[in-house]
């Protein structure tokens, strides 16, 4: 998108902060003074805008997105091209099968990126506190809340992956033991509950100004997610808020509080379900009223940065599509033919009455015809790839030559273990191997629009981390789990009817088509909600946590080893490089930071 948040580094202010916030009292950065600079709200905006820099690494395959997507049932990354592409020393095989260890690349990168993001937030909070008197009370409170809430999101990502983390609210080295999951959860909830009521409430007048920034909707959505997953994080009503004051808003069960937070978002009137599902993933999607928090993208090469292996650009469509898509669409960046769906995952789109198929049938699209329903978020009913008349959420079928609807792209420059060079490219659902797959194996996620003009190297589509649709489904699930309220309080909303109708937009009566395919939501079970969340939020970084919440994470396709099924696998191991740098306890002579129990002998 063209509209950008100010991420510019306020170099002068941060230079003054140095390695310790105490240096701020000792340095005078010429004329004007720091006090003068902090009295100008534009400078405060520039300073605070830096907190969003690290979140731009979230959706990379070597970052948080890759870690949580390839370990859930929705995603897979397999070596192709004779094992020459996407091998990476067996890294993806370990992720696919839940046999990872503490030296995994993305495991290390996620730790470093999120910790650095949280530390920067603490540094900026320190500056705001030191120069509080230079700002009006309103300006100080507004930006302090914005930074504290964003810090909570960085720590949430870290917490979601590792459980035990070095949570701190001060700009200083963390010297104590890692906090236990229930204590981290309590701190996150307390911070968000404190700030949420005072955050900006989005409306049409201020939507553009608050786009890509933390808002009240952001805070309550993250709170709802924390409450919904509290038990999955190991929290009970008896072990939370032991070391931090319980928020006055907290009352009843975790699910009661999830409902309350969802209602705060719903009743704000800030957000609206888009009538077109694919508009949320369009090239220019910044006007989506469904977006609660987004990573603001710039598909051009400026502002391009690498954090070790991780890039701050959206590349998901390029990671998944076959090599031939680059030539068909004329994209600037190569398409890398890596990520795909686990075949069994796509059964959530199975048509009613569809015949039972064998795993061999996954490799024959003619046998797959009629297997999937008309839900546009799925593979669809055509299975003709680039010759499809409609847009479908998962790509299955042929890859045509550019400018042709009949001639197929030929795999001339790559090696396939069973298909000779020059084989016509037809993508199928099946995956033949986790160590040396066919180039055509696996359905590819197709919902993010790709630039077909040769203008943008990377995705110009903004990445919506939180969507309003998630809030509606979280409330329904929380109610089914015993939270206050009724399912009908959601299903009678006009936005909810729009949500289910758009999934079957190609049908004459979309809302009825949804009910015919999946039943009446008012009669759904929790398993029905899980399936729908898979359909709605594929590859949007929610599925792993959903599966953990449902106690199904370690029973997905390709996870078969006894070690992979251990309960500890709901967390990733703390990176080896982190433990190596741990401070030493002077009394015991042992490292203060220790590995998560169950991973000690990696």
Question: Model segments located where?
Answer:
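Bacterial Sec-dependent N-terminal signal peptides
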Residues: 5, 15-42, 188, 224, ...
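Long, intrinsically disordered, low-complexity segments
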Residues: 20-21, 114-117, 280-341, 455-465, ...
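C-terminal substrate/ligand-recognition segments
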Residues: 104, 108, 365-499
């Amino acid at each position: 998108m063209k509209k950008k948040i100010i991420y510019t580094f306020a170099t002068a202010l941060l230079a003054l902060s140095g390695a310790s916030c105490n240096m701020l009292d000792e340095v005078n950065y010429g004329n004007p003074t720091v006090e003068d600079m902090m009295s100008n709200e534009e400078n405060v905006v520039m300073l605070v805008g830096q907190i969003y820099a690290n979140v731009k690494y979230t959706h990379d395959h070597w970052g948080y997105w890759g870690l949580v997507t390839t370990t859930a049932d929705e995603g897979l990354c397999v070596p192709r091209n004779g094992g020459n592409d996407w091998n990476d020393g067996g890294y993806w095989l370990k992720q696919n099968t839940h046999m990872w260890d503490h030296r995994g690349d993305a495991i290390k990168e996620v730790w470093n990126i999120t910790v650095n993001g949280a530390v920067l937030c603490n540094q900026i909070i320190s500056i705001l506190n030191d120069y509080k008197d230079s700002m009006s009370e309103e300006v100080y409170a507004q930006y302090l809340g914005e930074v504290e809430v964003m810090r909570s999101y960085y720590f949430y990502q870290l917490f979601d992956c590792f459980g035990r983390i070095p949570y701190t609210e001060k700009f200083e080295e963390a010297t104590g033991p890692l906090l236990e999951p229930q204590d981290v959860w309590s701190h996150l909830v307390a911070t968000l509950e404190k700030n949420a009521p005072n955050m900006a409430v989005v409306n049409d007048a201020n939507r553009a100004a608050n786009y890509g920034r933390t808002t009240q909707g952001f805070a309550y959505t993250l709170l709802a997610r924390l409450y919904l997953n509290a038990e999955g994080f190991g929290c009970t009503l008896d072990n939370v808020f032991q070391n931090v004051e319980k928020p006055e808003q907290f009352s009843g069960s975790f699910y009661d509080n999830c409902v309350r937070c969802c209602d705060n978002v719903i009743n704000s009137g800030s957000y609206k379900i888009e009538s077109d599902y694919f508009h949320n993933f369009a090239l220019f999607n910044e006007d989506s009223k469904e977006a609660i928090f987004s990573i603001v993208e710039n598909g051009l090469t400026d502002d391009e940065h690498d954090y070790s292996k991780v890039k701050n650009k959206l590349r998901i469509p390029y990671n998944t599509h076959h090599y031939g898509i680059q030539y068909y669409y004329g994209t600037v960046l190569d398409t890398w033919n890596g990520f795909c769906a686990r075949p069994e995952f796509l059964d959530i789109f199975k048509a009613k009455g569809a015949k039972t198929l064998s795993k061999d049938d996954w490799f024959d699209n003619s046998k797959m015809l009629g297997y999937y329903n008309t839900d546009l978020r799925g593979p669809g009913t055509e299975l003709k790839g680039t010759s499809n008349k409609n847009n479908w959420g998962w790509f299955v079928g042929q890859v045509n030559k550019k400018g042709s609807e009949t001639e197929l792209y030929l795999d001339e420059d790559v090696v396939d273990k069973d298909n000779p060079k020059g084989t016509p490219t037809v993508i199928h659902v099946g995956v033949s191997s986790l160590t040396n797959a066919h180039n055509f194996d696996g359905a590819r996620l197709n919902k993010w629009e790709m630039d077909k003009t040769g203008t943008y190297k990377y995705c110009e589509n903004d990445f919506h981390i939180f969507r309003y649709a998630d809030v509606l489904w979280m409330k329904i699930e929380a109610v089914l789990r015993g939270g206050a309220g009724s399912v009908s309080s959601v299903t009678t909303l006009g936005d909810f009817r729009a949500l289910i109708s758009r999934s079957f937009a190609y049908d004459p009566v979309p809302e009825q088509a949804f009910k015919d395919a999946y039943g009446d939501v008012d009669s759904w079970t929790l398993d029905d909600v899980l399936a729908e969340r898979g359909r709605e939020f594929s590859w949007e970084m929610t599925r792993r946590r959903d599966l953990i919440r449902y106690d199904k994470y370690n029973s997905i396709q390709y996870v078969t080893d006894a070690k992979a099924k251990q309960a500890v696998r709901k967390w990733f191991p703390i990176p080896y490089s982190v433990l190596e740098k741990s401070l030493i306890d002077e009394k015991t002579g042992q490292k203060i930071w220790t590995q998560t129990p169950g991973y000690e002998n990696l």
